[in-house]
Amino acid sequence: MFESKINPLWQSFILAVQEEVKPALGCTEPISLALAAAAAAAELDGTVERIDAWVSPNLMKNGMGVTVPGTGMVGLPIAAALGVLGGDAKAGLEVLKDASAKAVADAKAMLAAGHVAVMLQEPCNDILFSRAKVYSGDSWACVTIVGDHTNIVRIETDKGVVFTQADNAQEEEKTSPLGVLSHTSLEEILAFVNAVPFDAIRFILDAARLNGALSQEGLRGSWGLHIGSTLAKQCDRGLLAKDLSTAILIRTSAASDARMGGATLPAMSNSGSGNQGITATVPVMVVAEHVGADDERLARALMLSHLSAIYIHHQLPRLSALCAATTAAMGAAAGMAWLIDGRYDTIAMAISSMIGDVSGMICDGASNSCAMKVSTSASAAWKALLMALDDTAVTGNEGIVAHNVEQSIANLCSLACRSMQQTDKQIIEIMASKAH
């Protein structure tokens, strides 16, 4: 068995990827509220008549403008209503995967009747917080999710507390497979990818299957801003070259178009985000096809991409003012570099150049325009790699880029953790003023 060849560090890497790379149907912030609502509804015997919900400012930001799959509607209220009326509380981030047309119609009717209210949780010290309280006659149930999109910390009904999660976050961090990322390095991740038995990481090929299907759907339909299909038309008109760079741009954009436009296909997410999963997957797939990589080489490249993206994102808040498509694309740069020459120095140079390029991109909420940022990040990854292949990169003498890639990553993440907190507040204020 391959388990005997895997040391504890490598096993932690595999578990970290399995924990952070999961199928998700729909943008994960509204889906988190849908899950809370579905879990609350599951505690009641009668038909839910009314929903009150509270979310953190960051979750509100990422839920205001994004389409909920299968509904043609944007926002948190429809997500909460559909979670109650058609959600499967046991399905995690795929809570809405089996929602029927009748459930969608009933959810829209509940909204039209004014029976769904979504409010800001104030005060709120949690970046990711969603709470749904549902009512049926004199009975009610309330579910709270904190810290992670599926992390239910409390279930309560009118009869009393059903479940509460012990407050042992620090101990869990020590034992979590993600905890090992705080004291590892990109070099150790690369060594793992080069030597781990293929059978131990074969599962990552599911990312190519799911996100590849989303890309194809994005090119077929008119989803979201339809960036991918629009750019494909411009190729046919002779305004854009049909080359590898354009293929990366078009196919990655198309997957995000479908994702944000409400296609009823799951994305393989990364760090709680479908767009991050798409960004870490599709560029690597395109380059793998170009170089004729077999399944094993594709799996190793995808594992490097996804694990590098997780490694960087682990140094960030779960949600922040920094667009994390940029950090996911740093993972993609690593995966593409591995396919082309496999050298650590190439990977490090590509990531450093990306930090010198797209590090200022803000997250102004989940919406169709996320596909623009995904496409920009994917293109930046390819550009940075082309430079690195010629031993050219942004150096430690420039901006926030340091003389080694690990410090460059730390510098970028420190901006998001500290300085960009005020940026985040300003973004939320601007978006809230538009909603009134």
UniProtKB/Swiss-Prot annotation:
Name of the coding gene: yhaM
Protein name in the entry: UPF0597 protein YhaM
InterPro entries for this protein: Ser_deHydtase-like_asu (IPR005130), UPF0597 (IPR021144)
Lineage: Bacteria, Pseudomonadati, Pseudomonadota, Gammaproteobacteria, Enterobacterales
Family, per entry: Belongs to the UPF0597 family.
GO BP, one annotated term: L-cysteine catabolic process to pyruvate
GO MF assignments: L-cysteine desulfhydrase activity
Domain of life, per lineage: Bacteria
